[in-house]
Amino acid sequence: MFNKVEADIDGKLISIETGKLAKQASGSIVISCGGTVVLVTVVGAKTSNPNVDFLPLTIEYQEKFSAVGRVPGNYFRREIGRPSDQEVLTCRIIDRPLRPLFPEGYRSETQVIATVLSADQVNSPDVLALTGASAALSISHIPFAGPVAGGRIAYIDGKYVLNPTFAELESSSMDLMVACTRNAIVMVEGKADELSEDEILGAIFFAFENLQPLINLQDELQRANGLEKIVVESPVIDAELKAKVVEIAAAGMQKVYTTVDKLERGKVYDDLKKEVVAQLDTEEGLRASEISSLLSDFKKTYLREKTVNTGVRIGGRAWDEIRDISSETEYLPKTHGSALFTRGETQALVTATLGSERDKQRVETLNGETSRRFMLHYNFPPYCVGEARFLRGPSRRDIGHGTLATRGLEAVLPSEEDFPYAIRVVSEILESNGSSSMASVCGGSMAMMDAGVPLKRPVSGIAMGLIKEGEGVAILSDILGDEDHLGDMDFKVVGTCDGITALQMDIKIDGVSRDIMSNALDQAKRGRMHILEEMSKGIAEARAEVVEHAPKYFIHKISQDKIRDIIGPGGKIIKELSAQYDAKIEVDDSGLVKMFVANGALAEALVERVKSITAEVEVGAVYTGKVKTIKDFGAFVEILPGTDGLVHISELALERVKDVTDVVNEGDTIEVKVLDVDNRGRIRLSRKALLG
């Protein structure tokens, strides 16, 4: 049955309809705002998959170029291959708030596909896709504890703006994505221009209050068009077996809790599991998996309660204690900049490389082709967690972590006018036990300063966690991998001494109040300040100049009518200069010549050569030139690179000359004076004028 519901959200009409498109899907909706239209479908298998012990949920997001009336620019002229980074990031934005809302034990294959059908290049489709995914799940048979509403928050002239246009975002000091249910914030992600904790917190709860109409809209649609939800039976727990597991494992779990080293802690737990299974597995392996599951549940409960009740975390740290930090720069001799950053058992080796305008990343989006001057690539090889597996391309997680670090560092980059290099930062995670993306931020900041990038201020990042047991709340700084897995919140904050530049928050439970979030932000700030202080021991400020083996940058302004001289016919001159001086040379339409020279020793020579090629010929000036061509009526002399003038036979000598070659020959170097430049640019020279 076709149905359409609408709501005015902060002055913008958002509509959700169902019953017209993709009716064979388990749930299908079309959500629109202005001229932006997104189709979201969800399909869930009717039966559970017995071969998996996790939620088999897949999220896909597709941007069709037909949505903006364009043909893809690739050879095949169609959308092919892997999704773009933007599509991957939107998949993650949709996935993270939805995944915790499926019931435990739901094991049916489920796929959500969001397709951008029309884009007006004013209203962003990603926020619509998030809300649309929730709406499609809500009307399907799939069990889902939603609905969820998503929105983007801007901060313009001291005011929060919900779902700003692309033009409004250009003048905003914040770009924050927020997702919420009726009762709680469930996801936050975005960047800011060094804003305060209070300004960030205000944005989050501004979104929560103003997104409630979208929750109501989905409830209305679900009441009218929703299918009956399937019931997921909760697994029956053998209370007697559970009690035995707890009794046998209690003493050993304390050893797990107090073991500091990650690998050793894992070994202690594995030994404990073998012991418990050996004592209780009396049915030839039939109950081993059940015993392991009960032991895992006990571990989670034990570690959570121990942390909240004792004020001491896994490994013995206090709630706000940061692991030991060490850092150094200039670790790699031939990179432009490098830093080794280690925090506990998390280690990142980060490099910074400087490039020219041509090294910018070209990106084709629905809003047109753009270029990225700053790139940060995050790599997470299997050995960093002691595993062996095939090396693939970057995963969705890699892209997401790299983007978070990118956002955190972008706010402190110098302007392109002050520092015209393209910058590529690569973070290789060598060890991982929590917050490797934040190690990438710290290492990236240090590597760029080591390369001579004049950052406005150093940047650090910290991963926070939360454990809420009854009335007890533990806010944890610099969380471990185990604390991330067992906790109720993963909250990453990036910033400088002046404010927050990026953050990412995933909350798994209801009931995280504004006070708890405020306390978490304040505790994160104290942690960031401590980390910045530790980083300053490795490098406190950027080098005064880029390193010797980095490309050197020079600019020279020429008149627009000289652009053709520096380029030459078919690009001949500029190609010759690039090859001779090992340089990248770019000339824009205004006459600005940008030169990136790989060998600093050749830089000044290139600049002088460019100046000579584009110099204006002055009447009355004397030049030393080379005879290029001999004619019966005189000799053509090159007085500037690519600029020839004629010495008429009558201007070669004081006496009468019968044959030009009696005075000069091709290849001779002579001094000449400029007599005249006519309106066609022809230059008249004289040798005779210098002989009297």
Curated annotation (Swiss-Prot):
GO terms for molecular function: 3'-5'-RNA exonuclease activity; magnesium ion binding; polyribonucleotide nucleotidyltransferase activity; RNA binding. GO terms for cellular component: cytosol. One of its GO terms (biological process) is mRNA catabolic process. The keyword Plastid does not apply. Pfam families: KH_1, PNPase, RNase_PH, RNase_PH_C, S1. InterPro entries: ExoRNase_PH_dom1, ExoRNase_PH_dom2, ExoRNase_PH_dom2_sf, KH_dom, KH_dom_type_1, KH_dom_type_1_sf, NA-bd_OB-fold, PNPase. Residues 620-688 form the S1 motif domain. Its cofactor is Mg(2+). Residues 551-614 form the KH domain. It is an enzyme of class 2 (transferase). Keywords: Cytoplasm, Magnesium, Metal-binding, Nucleotidyltransferase, RNA-binding, Transferase. The keyword Cytoplasm applies. It catalyses: RNA(n+1) + phosphate = RNA(n) + a ribonucleoside 5'-diphosphate. It comes from the Bacteria. Transmembrane segments: none annotated. SMART domains: KH (SM00322), S1 (SM00316). It is found in: Cytoplasm. SUPFAM superfamilies: Eukaryotic type KH-domain (KH-domain type I) (SSF54791), Nucleic acid-binding proteins (SSF50249), Polynucleotide phosphorylase/guanosine pentaphosphate synthase (PNPase/GPSI), domain 3 (SSF46915), Ribonuclease PH domain 2-like (SSF55666), Ribosomal protein S5 domain 2-like (SSF54211). Its EC number is 2.7.7.8. Its main location: cytoplasm. Mg(2+) binds at residues 484, 490. PANTHER family: POLYRIBONUCLEOTIDE NUCLEOTIDYLTRANSFERASE, POLYRIBONUCLEOTIDE NUCLEOTIDYLTRANSFERASE 1, MITOCHONDRIAL. Belongs to the polyribonucleotide nucleotidyltransferase family. Involved in mRNA degradation. Catalyzes the phosphorolysis of single-stranded polyribonucleotides processively in the 3'- to 5'-direction. This is Polyribonucleotide nucleotidyltransferase. It comes from Desulfotalea psychrophila (strain LSv54 / DSM 12343). The gene is pnp.
